[in-house]
């Protein structure tokens, strides 16, 4: 089961139905990765910088907010508790302006990025980063978000 918690009302100004937007992105990603049949349990929190700052400090000892955090729980298996994803509206908005992309595109990217972390993908080493970015691009292209390139 996928559970979306909207913890900051500003998400409603980004998309009319934030819950459906998130569910569509995650479900399409699971399908593209050919793991939708596992029906994993994932909780997604649409939050703000304050919460992600607290979580980042507590779990990563980094004293600042970030765009997305993932907290893996179990290995992928049928109806497992795959983990939690939290996204900060403030950072997403700020980075969207910096990168000259839409907030929805950046949100979709961070949802896919967070999901891949739950599945064990990482980007600490160059070879891992190449694999993870390739999967992100493939999924975002399927969702028709890859057309809008990051202006970095």
Curated annotation (Swiss-Prot):
Q: What is this protein called?
A: Endoribonuclease YbeY
Q: Where are the transmembrane segments?
A: none
* Keywords, in A-Z order: Cytoplasm, Endonuclease, Hydrolase, Metal-binding, Nuclease, Ribosome biogenesis, rRNA processing, Zinc
Give the protein's function.
Single strand-specific metallo-endoribonuclease involved in late-stage 70S ribosome quality control and in maturation of the 3' terminus of the 16S rRNA.
Its needed co-factors are: Zn(2+)
Q: Name one GO cellular component term.
A: cytoplasm
Cited Pfam families: YbeY (PF02130)
Instruction: Indicate which residues the UniProt annotation says bind Zn(2+).
Output: 113, 117, 123
What Gene3D superfamilies does the database record attribute to this sequence? Metalloproteases ('zincins'), catalytic domain
Q: How is the cofactor bound?
A: Binds 1 zinc ion.
- From the Swiss-Prot or TrEMBL record, what is one GO molecular function term? zinc ion binding
Native source organism of the sequence: Wolbachia pipientis subsp. Culex pipiens (strain wPip)
Family recorded in the similarity comment: Belongs to the endoribonuclease YbeY family.
Could you mention a single GO BP entry for this protein? rRNA processing
* Ranges in a coiled coil: none
Matching entries from NCBIfam families are given as: rRNA maturation RNase YbeY
């Amino acid at each position: 089961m996928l559970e979306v918690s909207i913890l900051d009302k500003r998400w409603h100004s980004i998309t009319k139905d934030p819950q459906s937007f998130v569910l569509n992105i995650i479900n399409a990603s699971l399908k593209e990765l050919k793991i939708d049949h596992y029906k994993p349990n994932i909780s997604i929190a649409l939050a703000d910088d304050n919460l992600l700052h607290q979580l980042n400090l507590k779990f990563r000892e980094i004293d600042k907010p970030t765009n997305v955090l993932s907290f893996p729980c179990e290995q992928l298996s049928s109806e497992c508790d795959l983990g939690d994803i939290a996204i900060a509206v403030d950072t997403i908005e700020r980075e969207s302006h910096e990168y000259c992309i839409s907030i929805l595109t950046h949100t979709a990217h961070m949802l896919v990025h967070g999901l891949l972390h739950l599945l064990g993908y990482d980007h600490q080493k160059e070879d891992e980063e190449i694999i993870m970015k390739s999967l992100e691009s493939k999924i975002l292209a399927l969702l028709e978000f890859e057309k809008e390139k990051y202006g970095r």
